[in-house]
Amino acid sequence: MVRYSAAPALETKCAKARGAYLRTHFKNSREVAFTINGMNLKKAFIFLDNVKEHKQAVPFRRFNGGVGRTAQGKEFGVTQARWPVKSVNFFYDLLKNAEANAEAKGLDMDKLIIKHVQVNAAPKQRRRTYRAHGRVTAYLSSPSHIEIIVAEEEEAVPKANDTVSRVSLKQGAKARNLAARKAITSA
């Protein structure tokens, strides 16, 4: 059994999926994960499809040095955004896996929400490129470990109608004085 970094509240109401040593950039994957976390599963699939078609962009909030600006970032309140298609494809496949796991458990597909997404940096893979004057430079890739937990949305418990009115000390004293006066005048 593989260990996940987060434990769901109800194991029977959630489904999990994970990928290890995925050949996609860690920084791009982190930004995609941050964007889809908390989304409804169907909405996440639509968003990822739109990113593939360049209809929506993934906002880059943390790893945004040198990232160009686009108007598609405005919907998330940022100016810097990109379309990391390779990372999006990996997330799409992992979400499909989580969806299949949820269906196997008999969960309601319309109520599934992405509760937990985590991206960790995997060990760098080393290659080399040859430079002028006989030098060699490292040519590293930054793969990722990704884990996803989807869960059914909990039903909201209706709030009780009983509202206790809070009174300050001054208001309480006034009420007691008024009650005492009424008792004196009525007697």
UniProtKB/Swiss-Prot annotation:
- Keyword Cytoplasm included in the entry's annotation: yes
Q: Which Pfam families match?
A: Ribosomal_L22 (PF00237)
Entry GO MF terms:
structural constituent of ribosome
Cellular localisation: Cytoplasm
Question: What are the entry keywords?
Answer: Cytoplasm, Ribonucleoprotein, Ribosomal protein
- SUPFAM superfamilies (UniProt xref): Ribosomal protein L22
Q: Per the UniProt entry, what is one GO biological process?
A: cytoplasmic translation
CDD domains in the record = Ribosomal_L22 (cd00336)
PROSITE patterns named in the record = RIBOSOMAL_L22 (PS00464)
Organism domain of life: Eukaryota
Q: Does the keyword Electron transport apply?
A: no
A GO CC term?
Answer: cytosolic large ribosomal subunit
Role noted for this protein: Component of the ribosome, a large ribonucleoprotein complex responsible for the synthesis of proteins in the cell. The small ribosomal subunit (SSU) binds messenger RNAs (mRNAs) and translates the encoded message by selecting cognate aminoacyl-transfer RNA (tRNA) molecules. The large subunit (LSU) contains the ribosomal catalytic site termed the peptidyl transferase center (PTC), which catalyzes the formation of peptide bonds, thereby polymerizing the amino acids delivered by tRNAs into a polypeptide chain.
Q: What else is known?
A: There are 2 genes for uL22 in S.pombe.
Subunit and interaction comment: Component of the large ribosomal subunit (LSU). Mature yeast ribosomes consist of a small (40S) and a large (60S) subunit. The 40S small subunit contains 1 molecule of ribosomal RNA (18S rRNA) and at least 33 different proteins. The large 60S subunit contains 3 rRNA molecules (25S, 5.8S and 5S rRNA) and at least 46 different proteins. uL22 is associated with the polypeptide exit tunnel.
Tell me its family.
Belongs to the universal ribosomal protein uL22 family.
Q: What is this protein called?
A: Large ribosomal subunit protein uL22B
Biological source species = Schizosaccharomyces pombe (strain 972 / ATCC 24843) (Fission yeast)
